[in-house]
Curated annotation (Swiss-Prot):
Subunit structure comment from the entry: Forms oligomers.
Compartment(s): Cytoplasm, Nucleoid
Any GO molecular function: transcription cis-regulatory region binding
GO biological process: negative regulation of DNA-templated transcription initiation
Cellular component GO terms, alphabetical: cytoplasm; nucleoid
NCBIfam families for this protein: PRK00326.2-2
Keywords tagged on the record: Cytoplasm, DNA-binding, Repeat, Transcription, Transcription regulation
Family: Belongs to the MraZ family.
Gene this protein is translated from: mraZ
Pfam families: MraZ
This protein's record includes keyword Repeat: yes
Disulfide bonds: none
Record protein name field: Transcriptional regulator MraZ
């Protein structure tokens, strides 16, 4: 199944709820089949991660599970590996999709991203990223000259 693609802007309400675009909801709501019924299961859970670039990253359970498997390989007895695990889980939260297609973001998550009223949601293949609109535009304009060299180097 194709990844998340596209960009939409939505308002965050006074309770910190953000509407997930319908085209993205369709993608992550259809997970593996329910073992009991054989029907496609619906998983309204998303993992929210505070990224270093000031955005929030949203992961569906199957994608986060792959990352978690990598973390499980790290040793609690290795100080660097233990630190990394602690730092990742300290930046992670879990939220659920409500019946209106919204997720509730904690004040801590909103503050990290600088989101007050509006947010831009970008489909970024296996994840979605959530940005404060001006912060995103500043990042894109400040780095516009880097696009072609980066694209030529990595894709």
């Amino acid at each position: 199944m194709p990844g998340f693609i596209g960009r939409e802007q939505h308002s965050v309400d006074e309770k910190g709820r953000l509407l997930i675009p319908a085209r993205f909801r369709r993608r992550f709501l259809l997970q593996e089949n329910d073992p009991a019924t054989g029907a496609p299961s619906r998983s309204p859970v998303l993992y929210v991660f505070k990224a270093d670039d000031g955005s929030l990253e949203l992961y569906e359970p199957s994608v986060w599970s792959e990352k978690e498997q990598q973390l499980l390989k790290l040793s609690d007895f290795n100080p660097d590996e233990r630190l990394l695990t602690t730092m990742i889980y300290a930046r992670l939260d879990q939220t659920e999709l409500d019946r209106s297609g919204r997720i509730a973001l904690s004040r801590e998550m909103l503050d990290h991203a600088g989101i007050v009223k509006d947010a831009v949601i970008i489909g970024a293949n296996a994840k979605m990223t959530v940005w404060e609109p001006l912060r995103l535009e500043r990042l894109l304009s400040d780095n516009a000259s880097r696009f072609a060299p980066l694209a030529n180097r990595y894709i």
